[in-house]
Amino acid sequence: MSGSTPFQMRLVHLDLKGAPPKVSYLSEIFPLFRALGANGLLIEYEDMFPYEGPLRLLRAKYAYSPSEIKEILHLAGLNELEVIPLVQTFGHMEFVLKHTAFAHLREVGSFPCTLNPHEAESLALVGAMIDQVLELHPGAQRLHIGCDEVYYLGEGEASRRWLQQEQNSTGKLCLSHMRAVASGVKARRPSVTPLVWDDMLRDLPEDQLAASGVPQLVEPVLWDYTADLDVHGKVLLMQKYRRCGFPQLWAASAFKGATGPSQAVPPVEHHLRNHVQWLQVAGSGPTDSLQGIILTGWQRYDHYSVLCELLPAGVPSLAACLQLLLRGGFDEDVKAKVENLLGISSLEKTDPVREGAGSFPGSNILALVTQVSLHLRSSVDALLEGNRYVTGWFSPYHRQRKLIHPVMVQHIQPAALSLLAQWSTLVQELEAALQLAFYPDAVEEWLEENVHPSLQRLQALLQDLSEVSAPPLPPTSPGRDVAQDP
């Protein structure tokens, strides 16, 4: 299958608010991105950006240094990947508003997600963030200013008072802040075009949107990560945006991080269907209105949620989706090319450790993560809840009272020790692989969430077995000092 893609720009989204890769791993993976068909990156730095001055407290423990940002941009340039930085400026501001120093700028005092658009200090804050990001991205042509999922907008005290005035609405409030931020970007760097996520714009009346001045300032990114995307609805939305005056639009799909907050390995078929439907949207919508597509790879649903699929685990899905976009479909030839590029035997494999992990950077992480996600909990469950000797002779009742028929120890202990040894070996290998690609806090978090609970259940069983099967201490007479000579 061959064909020209309607998406001239194909950007891979790097969501750094969880498990940010080390620069050394990015140096290995960027050439693969290019080989797969990407020509740009959307980098959502969040707390990994090296903010300075009063913003320094936003930095994560292992935030990139300015020199590392320059190295990332250099690596991207070597691989002909345009970098678009993303700075959240309205919703999803938890990484800023969680700090006491900025808590007074929350739209709703108890929730750190949304910025209060009425405070002049709010605009100064996002302006300072944008200044620092643009300073370290001197060649940036575009800047994504977020503005998605602005939850609880209109529910703060200042907003409630403002909304009591005639002709005011949450839509008007949203557009006003978006316009102010985008105008600030253009004032700072006239050559930079701001991008925004489109969800806060979708339901606004056309006349309000057209009259707001926003269409002359930003390019909206229409996002939908579902496998049953409403193609006709998206085409109508594109037509609406064009009528409102937006000259250029973008699409956003997903290659990972969109099928559950604790997903470990992306379901490739889901993501392929999502991209097939985006191709249908591009083919049916206004001609040449789509600048490109952003393949999002979310790493957390928000700042406080657990980690979803790690970047190496998402590479096969990303590869399949990029090649589908380039070739206009996903037949056996395209599938074979993806498998060849990644050095894997099959995209559908269920046991990469046995069938071959692949040759792409981080392929060993994918293989080991797949083993853990498919088999760790189920194997421990099988022992603790499916083994007749455990359920019949060493139940929670028995364990609490330290009771067991001595003969049963030999039926339970060897199996538990063998299972623990098997998983301990694999987990050591996984931890070593993770440490090469990620910082210590991400390694610790992933293992604590996905590995330790099951291993601790196994270790607790063995500890209880050890205690119950230990030889009893010799009895002593009540009140008699055992150390006393007869």
From Swiss-Prot:
One of its GO terms (molecular function) is hexosaminidase activity. SUPFAM superfamilies: (Trans)glycosidases. Its main location: cytoplasm. Optimum pH is 6.7. It is an enzyme of class 3 (hydrolase). It is found in: Cytoplasm; Nucleus; Extracellular vesicle. Inhibited by O-(2-acetamido-2-deoxy-D-glucopyranosylidene)amino N-phenylcarbamate (PUGNAc). Inhibited by galacto-NAG-thiazoline. Belongs to the glycosyl hydrolase 20 family. This is Hexosaminidase D.
